[in-house]
Amino acid sequence: MRAWRLDLALAPTDQLPRNPSGNEPVPLKLILAKKAYSSWSLRPWILLAQLKIPFEEVIIPMDQPETRAGMLKYAPTGKCPSLQDGKIAIWESLAIIEYLAEAYPEKTVWPKGKAARAHARSLASEMHAGFVALRQTCPTNFRRPVKAIALSDEVRGDVARIEAAWAHARATFGRGGAFLFGRFSAADAMFAPVVNRLHVYDVSVSTQTRAYMEAIMALPAWKAWIADARAEPWRIERYDAI
């Protein structure tokens, strides 16, 4: 178990401090699967890290005999991610995000403005429930070399919808910054694993889409996650072989 209090102004990213004071309590505990392969774990993790909300991480490797038993200690679904705040347990990425928005209103988890928040929540829910073809064809692998694969019409349809959604959010709400709603928010956290999929599977995208992807991949929190993923000893051959 490791504590995170990220000073995201520091560089290089592999020196981001883990609980540098050594004695301050960290109230939140985020339970994750392998960083190399878990898209759902990244979503709350990058939100917590980028918004500088202190937390501890507990990694329970996937595809191990003890995986489900370990995850059941923290969530009744036996899946990751889940969040512990003292005696309060929260599971599922969107539920964790909404809990953080309520617990840390000063952190602007969702965009400011009623219309922007409604749009951001809609996009986050669409991501949570949709884009099945892309997710099945291009499984998450944060240390995969950049290499193209054949894509079906269904996958290309998912990509087209994602590009349109990002472009509309940027044009309507994102003029104040590099992210979907200007400042980094939960909507960006929900789509962060998609950025990785489009990048490592070398999917052809517009210049505008690529600029947004580069903004996400330039985040210190993103770089810290990728560094951790590459350092993990665990391998899942069925994903690495794609």
Name what the model sees in each region:
Residues L6, Q15-L151:
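GST-like domain detector, emphasizing the conserved glutathione-binding G-site
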Residues W40, W91, W110, V159, ...:
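Tryptophan-centric aromatic hotspots in well-structured domains and transmembrane helices
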Residues L30-L32, V58, G182, H199-V200, ...:
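Short, contiguous strand/loop micro-motifs
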Residues P61, A186, A229:
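Short, solvent-exposed turn/loop segments enriched in Gly/Ser/Thr/Pro and often Arg
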Residues R2-L8:
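Extreme N-terminal basic, low-complexity initiation segments
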Residues T209-I242:
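Long hydrophobic alpha-helical segments typical of transmembrane helices together
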Residues M127, F131-A218:
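GST-like fold's C-terminal all-alpha helical module
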